[in-house]
Amino acid sequence: MARVTVEDCIDKVENRFELVLLASHRARLVSQGAPITVDRDNDKNPVVALREIADETLSPGDLKEDLIHSLQKHVEVDEPEPDPASLVQTEATPAFAEAAEEEDQPEALTFDRMSEEELLAGIEGLVPPEKSDDY
Protein backbone atom coordinates (compact mmCIF):
# COMPACT_ATOMS: atom_id res chain seq x y z
CA MET A 1 0.00 0.00 0.00
CA ALA A 2 2.74 2.48 0.95
CA ARG A 3 4.73 1.90 -2.24
CA VAL A 4 1.78 2.87 -4.42
CA THR A 5 1.15 5.88 -2.19
CA VAL A 6 4.77 7.07 -2.51
CA GLU A 7 4.60 6.76 -6.28
CA ASP A 8 1.44 8.87 -6.26
CA CYS A 9 3.15 11.49 -4.09
CA ILE A 10 6.19 11.90 -6.34
CA ASP A 11 3.92 13.73 -8.80
CA LYS A 12 3.03 16.27 -6.09
CA VAL A 13 6.44 16.61 -4.38
CA GLU A 14 9.26 15.99 -6.82
CA ASN A 15 12.08 15.63 -4.30
CA ARG A 16 11.66 12.34 -2.44
CA PHE A 17 13.73 13.57 0.52
CA GLU A 18 11.43 16.55 0.90
CA LEU A 19 8.49 14.15 0.63
CA VAL A 20 9.88 12.15 3.56
CA LEU A 21 10.25 15.32 5.64
CA LEU A 22 6.74 16.54 4.84
CA ALA A 23 5.07 13.17 5.38
CA SER A 24 6.88 12.55 8.66
CA HIS A 25 5.95 16.02 9.90
CA ARG A 26 2.32 15.43 8.95
CA ALA A 27 2.36 11.98 10.60
CA ARG A 28 3.62 13.59 13.82
CA LEU A 29 0.82 16.15 13.63
CA VAL A 30 -1.73 13.36 13.17
CA SER A 31 -0.32 11.48 16.16
CA GLN A 32 -0.65 14.69 18.21
CA GLY A 33 -4.34 14.86 17.37
CA ALA A 34 -4.58 16.88 14.14
CA PRO A 35 -7.69 15.99 12.13
CA ILE A 36 -7.08 13.78 9.10
CA THR A 37 -8.56 14.71 5.75
CA VAL A 38 -8.85 11.20 4.22
CA ASP A 39 -10.35 7.93 5.42
CA ARG A 40 -7.98 6.08 7.75
CA ASP A 41 -8.83 2.57 6.43
CA ASN A 42 -6.86 1.01 9.32
CA ASP A 43 -3.63 2.62 8.04
CA LYS A 44 -0.84 3.94 10.22
CA ASN A 45 -0.09 7.64 10.48
CA PRO A 46 2.76 7.78 7.90
CA VAL A 47 0.57 6.07 5.29
CA VAL A 48 -2.31 8.42 6.10
CA ALA A 49 0.05 11.39 5.68
CA LEU A 50 1.24 10.09 2.32
CA ARG A 51 -2.35 9.53 1.18
CA GLU A 52 -3.25 13.09 2.19
CA ILE A 53 -0.37 14.42 0.10
CA ALA A 54 -1.23 12.14 -2.84
CA ASP A 55 -4.93 13.11 -2.78
CA GLU A 56 -3.93 16.80 -2.55
CA THR A 57 -6.14 17.38 0.47
CA LEU A 58 -3.12 19.16 1.95
CA SER A 59 -0.87 21.58 0.10
CA PRO A 60 2.81 20.57 0.12
CA GLY A 61 3.69 24.28 0.35
CA ASP A 62 1.60 24.70 3.49
CA LEU A 63 3.13 21.58 5.01
CA LYS A 64 6.62 22.84 4.20
CA GLU A 65 5.92 26.21 5.79
CA ASP A 66 4.47 24.54 8.88
CA LEU A 67 7.53 22.28 9.11
CA ILE A 68 9.87 25.26 8.92
CA HIS A 69 7.95 27.10 11.64
CA SER A 70 8.02 24.03 13.88
CA LEU A 71 11.82 23.78 13.56
CA GLN A 72 12.56 27.45 14.18
CA LYS A 73 13.98 28.26 17.58
CA HIS A 74 14.17 32.02 17.10
CA VAL A 75 11.49 33.77 15.12
CA GLU A 76 12.49 37.08 13.58
CA VAL A 77 9.98 39.85 13.87
CA ASP A 78 9.93 42.43 11.12
CA GLU A 79 10.49 45.76 12.78
CA PRO A 80 9.09 48.83 11.09
CA GLU A 81 11.62 51.09 9.44
CA PRO A 82 12.31 54.35 11.25
CA ASP A 83 10.29 57.34 10.20
CA PRO A 84 12.33 59.77 8.02
CA ALA A 85 11.10 62.69 10.15
CA SER A 86 12.57 61.13 13.30
CA LEU A 87 15.89 60.62 11.50
CA VAL A 88 16.03 64.32 10.66
CA GLN A 89 15.41 65.22 14.31
CA THR A 90 18.19 62.94 15.57
CA GLU A 91 20.63 64.35 13.01
CA ALA A 92 19.77 67.89 14.11
CA THR A 93 20.78 67.23 17.73
CA PRO A 94 24.06 65.28 17.59
CA ALA A 95 25.59 67.27 20.48
CA PHE A 96 22.83 66.09 22.81
CA ALA A 97 23.35 62.48 21.73
CA GLU A 98 27.12 62.72 22.33
CA ALA A 99 26.54 64.19 25.80
CA ALA A 100 24.22 61.32 26.66
CA GLU A 101 26.81 58.79 25.46
CA GLU A 102 29.52 60.42 27.59
CA GLU A 103 27.32 60.14 30.67
CA ASP A 104 26.91 56.40 30.08
CA GLN A 105 30.62 55.68 29.53
CA PRO A 106 31.90 55.70 33.16
CA GLU A 107 29.23 53.22 34.25
CA ALA A 108 30.04 50.84 31.39
CA LEU A 109 33.80 50.87 32.05
CA THR A 110 33.80 50.22 35.80
CA PHE A 111 34.99 46.66 35.30
CA ASP A 112 38.22 47.97 33.69
CA ARG A 113 39.21 49.91 36.82
CA MET A 114 40.38 47.09 39.08
CA SER A 115 43.64 47.50 40.94
CA GLU A 116 46.52 45.12 40.44
CA GLU A 117 46.00 43.67 43.91
CA GLU A 118 42.35 42.91 43.14
CA LEU A 119 43.33 41.18 39.90
CA LEU A 120 45.99 39.06 41.65
CA ALA A 121 43.55 38.13 44.40
CA GLY A 122 41.01 37.08 41.77
CA ILE A 123 43.58 34.96 39.92
CA GLU A 124 44.73 33.28 43.13
CA GLY A 125 41.11 32.48 43.98
CA LEU A 126 40.65 30.48 40.77
CA VAL A 127 40.45 26.72 41.21
CA PRO A 128 42.41 24.65 38.66
CA PRO A 129 40.29 22.21 36.66
CA GLU A 130 40.37 18.57 37.65
CA LYS A 131 42.33 16.25 35.40
CA SER A 132 40.34 13.70 33.49
CA ASP A 133 41.22 10.74 31.28
CA ASP A 134 39.52 12.26 28.22
CA TYR A 135 42.76 13.51 26.66
From Swiss-Prot:
Signal peptide: none annotated. GO terms for cellular component: DNA-directed RNA polymerase complex. Its EC number is 2.7.7.6. Gene3D superfamilies: 3.90.940.10. It catalyses: RNA(n) + a ribonucleoside 5'-triphosphate = RNA(n+1) + diphosphate. GO terms for biological process: DNA-templated transcription. It holds the Pfam family RNA_pol_Rpb6. Keywords: DNA-directed RNA polymerase, Nucleotidyltransferase, Transcription, Transferase. GO terms for molecular function: DNA binding; DNA-directed RNA polymerase activity. Belongs to the RNA polymerase subunit omega family. The RNAP catalytic core consists of 2 alpha, 1 beta, 1 beta' and 1 omega subunit. When a sigma factor is associated with the core the holoenzyme is formed, which can initiate transcription. Promotes RNA polymerase assembly. Latches the N- and C-terminal regions of the beta' subunit thereby facilitating its interaction with the beta and alpha subunits. This is DNA-directed RNA polymerase subunit omega. It comes from Sinorhizobium medicae (strain WSM419).
